[in-house]
């Protein structure tokens, strides 16, 4: 176990937000993968006991013994009690900037590990400033970004660098993550978080600067480096022989990867570079597709910057928190990512990362679940803080993702 300071606790994992769409997917996965009479002790939590009972009933008779815990996101006493009963809290209650702060504080104070799906850079920065030092004292591992943003990217860099070092004796001086293909929809929670993030950035220039700065999640005094702003336009990549467009999640993922590198003590060197983009194809059609993608993303961000149009988007266009695709669409989904690393001598090292379900729901719920189980059950380095998936879990998490969550990490010739 990774946290001797926790002592004996009633549960290994408590799922907060179990009545939401993603929370229910997590509950289904834990039941299917770990059952209720095995080594993993888990419970469901939320603010409405009746809805919790409905979720438990929907899981079938095999879940009849799963404990239910009532805890509202703003009830500090209930949250503290919840955290003291478990090794890990897994939460799907977002936007986290609105609903997550008190739970993080309770986890830190009780030395309880924590994982979420937050992609809200401004809020993660706030949690680092408020709780990193205290979490180091209590041993609590506070791990944000445990879904499609940013597990495949953060763990992917960890994987490629170690594979490169093992094969060539040196780390890559740069890595590019290219999204080759995805099938699926962004979760309602992710979209709600994105809308709130844009809203807050319009109201507070400091938040806007945090979103733009490439090293804004790095430790204080370590926010300089070679990387600039994330890709903003269509660019032709000679190494991929294709056009690329901006990737909507790059603004989160790239900062998480850079924080991982900083927390690890800069093993790849302080001149290490990292970027992300979407492959749009070759020739004129690739350029045109990339241009349409870029303009479409820009249009959404522009419309979301103003209250009236943002409200219209949330009401009529974007999926809402608690909504999601049916099971067939989840199973039909997938993602396929390509990494291109460059060694100091110019040698290219490539890897492929894939997921077997839609990134927004099916794969994300499995990744988040395995992060929680990893924090609860695996032998991890015994230190706390506001961490990243790669720094907090590293190799044990890759093993779990490969074995249980349908992800692949492969070095390519």
Predicted segments with their positions:
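A short, Lys/Arg-enriched amphipathic alpha-helix followed by its capping loop at the start of a domain
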Residues: 29-39, 264-266
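Conserved Rossmann-fold cofactor-binding substructure of NAD(P)-dependent oxidoreductases
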Residues: 70-86, 92-98
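Conserved glycine-rich Rossmann-like NAD(P)H-binding loop of the short-chain dehydrogenase/reductase
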Residues: 35-51
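Structural motif
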Residues: 12, 87-88, 113
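N-terminal Rossmann NAD(P)H-binding glycine-rich loop of SDR-like oxidoreductase domains
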Residues: 11-34
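C-terminal catalytic/substrate-binding lobe primarily of soluble NAD(P)-dependent oxidoreductases
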Residues: 2-6, 23, 162-413
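Glycine-/Pro-rich loop/turn segments that contact NAD(P) or position catalytic residues
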Residues: 95-216
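Rossmann-fold cofactor-recognition segment
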Residues: 59-75
């Amino acid at each position: 176990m990774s946290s001797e300071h926790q002592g004996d606790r009633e549960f290994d994992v408590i799922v907060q937000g179990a009545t939401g769409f993603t929370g229910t997917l997590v509950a289904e996965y834990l039941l299917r993968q770990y059952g209720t009479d095995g080594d993993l002790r888990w419970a469901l939590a939320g603010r409405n006991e009746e809805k919790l009972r409905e979720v438990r009933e929907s899981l079938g008779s095999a879940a009849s013994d799963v404990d239910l815990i009532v805890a509202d996101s703003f009830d500090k006493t209930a949250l503290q009690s919840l955290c003291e009963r478990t090794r890990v809290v897994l939460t799907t209650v977002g936007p986290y900037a609105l609903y997550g702060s008190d739970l993080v504080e309770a986890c830190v104070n009780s030395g309880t590990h924590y994982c979420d799906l937050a992609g809200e850079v401004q809020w993660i920065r706030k949690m680092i400033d408020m709780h990193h030092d205290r979490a180091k004292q209590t041993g609590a591992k506070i791990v944000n970004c445990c879904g499609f943003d940013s597990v495949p990217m953060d763990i992917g860099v960890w994987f490629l660098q170690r594979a490169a070092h093992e094969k060539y004796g040196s780390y890559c001086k740069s890595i590019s993550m290219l999204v080759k293909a995805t099938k699926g929809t962004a979760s309602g929670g992710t979209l709600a978080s994105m809308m709130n993030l844009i809203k807050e950035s319009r109201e507070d220039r400091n938040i806007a600067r945090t979103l733009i700065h490439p090293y804004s999640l790095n430790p204080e005094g370590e926010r300089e480096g070679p990387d600039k702003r994330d890709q903003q336009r269509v660019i032709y990549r000679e190494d991929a022989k294709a056009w690329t467009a901006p990737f909507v999640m790059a603004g989160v993922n790239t900062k998480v990867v850079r924080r991982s590198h900083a927390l690890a003590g800069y093993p790849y060197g302080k001149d290490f570079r990292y970027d992300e983009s979407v492959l749009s194809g070759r020739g004129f059609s690739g350029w045109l597709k990339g241009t349409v993608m870029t303009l479409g993303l820009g249009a959404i961000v522009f419309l979301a910057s103003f209250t009236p149009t943002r409200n219209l988007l949330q009401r009529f266009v974007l999926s809402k928190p608690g909504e999601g695709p049916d099971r067939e669409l989840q199973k039909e989904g997938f993602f396929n990512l390509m990494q291109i690393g460059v060694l100091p001598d110019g040698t290219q090292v490539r890897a492929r990362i894939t997921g077997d379900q839609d990134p927004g729901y099916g794969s994300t719920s499995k990744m988040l679940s395995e992060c929680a189980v990893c924090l609860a059950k695996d032998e991890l380095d015994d230190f706390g803080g506001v961490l990243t998936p790669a720094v907090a879990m590293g190799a044990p998490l890759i093993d779990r993702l490969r074995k249980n969550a349908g992800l692949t990490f492969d070095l390519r010739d």
